[in-house]
Design a protein with these regions (language model features):
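Beta-propeller domain segments
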Residues: 1-175, 187, 210-215
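C-terminal structured "cap/appendage" subdomains that terminate the fold
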Residues: 166, 175-198
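Blade-level signature of beta-propeller repeat domains, shared across WD40, Kelch, NHL, RCC1
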Residues: 193-223
Length: 223
């Protein structure tokens, strides 16, 4: 029987030796639903972070980074007492007695409007990978990511892409008919996967909950 610690904690984690859990690597995230590493190592670790009311986001995670929740949702100010009406001002730096105190809160590289807004793109970002495969040459070096569904009741998952930028938000678009992949998926998209060659897959279901036998895995291939 192993009665010792069930895992190790890197001694350079930002909260080691100070108030807070030693396990914490980054914070200020609302619901980091999935994470993935750039297999080429250029951008490191991505986290898709499901928003509360207005914005979905994807961030690049760094050691000790504070991503602003719950004073920011995406790049926008957030008020937990009134989540549908962003305040005009909010903190923009890390507070005292926190790792990286005095440094700027970290904004996402991708954000888009949630379906709870009139012009929302969909319900919950579910996964994303920096594409390093070869089959979809036009998407090489782009972040490909998934949306659970266009609306909360119908299986209308969607796929998007974002082009990395040196600063600010990455330019994004939807994968639609006529593009390398038709991203208008007639299923709920539960998540994505990546194989040893960098090619991408999506896991889907036609049910909103884990029932039935409609689960499928699809590989993204050129049209």
């Amino acid at each position: 029987m192993n009665t010792g610690d069930p895992y190790g904690i890197p001694q350079d984690n930002p909260f080691v030796g100070r108030e807070g859990l030693d396990e914490i690597y980054a914070y200020g995230l609302r619901n980091p639903y999935r994470m993935s590493f750039d297999r080429a190592g250029e951008y490191g670790l991505f986290a898709v972070d499901a928003g509360e009311h207005l914005w979905e986001e994807i961030s690049i995670i760094i050691e000790g980074g504070n991503y602003g929740w719950n004073v920011k949702e995406g790049t926008h100010c957030f008020d937990a007492a009134n989540p549908t009406e962003p305040p005009e001002q909010c903190p923009d730096i890390v507070g005292l007695n926190h790792p990286n105190q005095g440094k700027a809160l970290i904004d996402p590289v991708v954000e888009f409007v949630n379906a709870k807004q009139p012009d929302g793109l969909g319900v919950n970002v579910t996964d994303g990978f920096l594409y390093r495969g070869t089959a979809l040459s036009d998407l090489q070096g782009h972040l490909v990511f998934s949306m659970w569904s266009r609306n909360p009741t119908e299986p209308q998952g969607r796929l998007f892409y974002a082009l990395p930028a040196a600063t600010g938000l990455w330019q994004m678009g939807e994968l639609t008919p006529g593009q390398p992949v038709d991203g208008s998926v007639g299923h709920f998209i539960l998540g994505m996967g990546q194989d040893a060659g960098g090619e991408l897959y999506i896991a889907t279901s036609d049910e909103r909950t884990p029932v039935g036998q409609t689960g499928r895995v699809y590989k993204l291939i050129p049209r």
